[in-house]
Amino acid sequence: DKLFLSTNNVEASKLLFNIWDIWSIADNQETQILFDEANQFMDVGELDNAIELFSKVVEQSPEFAEGWNKRATVYFLKGELNKSISDIEKTLYLEPRHFGALDGLAEIYLMKDDLVGAAATYRRILEIIPSSKKSQDRLRLINDLLV
C-alpha cells in the first residue's frame, strides 16, 4: 500500500528493494539454500542447472511465489516463453501484486506482438506502482501504436 501511495521515486525504489528482499525469503532453510544456489547458477548463465534447482524449490515449497517467478525468468532467458508464462501465472496466483512477474509477462506479450495484452499488463503494474516510469512510457508508446 505504501508503494501505491508513493510519489517519490527514491522512496518507491527503496520500497521495491524491500519487497524483493521479502519475496526472496523461503519458508524453510532447505528451500532457501536451493533457491540461493539456483540464483547463483542463473547469475552465471548456467540456466539448465538453475531450472533444475528452481524446479526442486517449487516442488518443495509450492506456495513460494518467488521460486515460480525465478524459474519463469530462466525459462524466459532460454526463450521458452510458454513455460515462462505458465510459471508467471502461478506466481501471480500466489502473489497477485508481483510487479516483477507482471513486467516479465508484459515483455513476453511484446515479443509476441500482443500489444493489447502488453498494455493491459502495464496498466496492472501501474495499479501497483503508479510512479513506474517504465510502465508509463511503455503504455504511452503502445497506445500510440494502437491508435
What are these regions (language model features)?
Residues 1-27:
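Long, contiguous interaction/recruitment modules in multidomain scaffold/adaptor proteins
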Residues 13-16, 32, 51, 85, ...:
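Conserved positions within tetratricopeptide repeat
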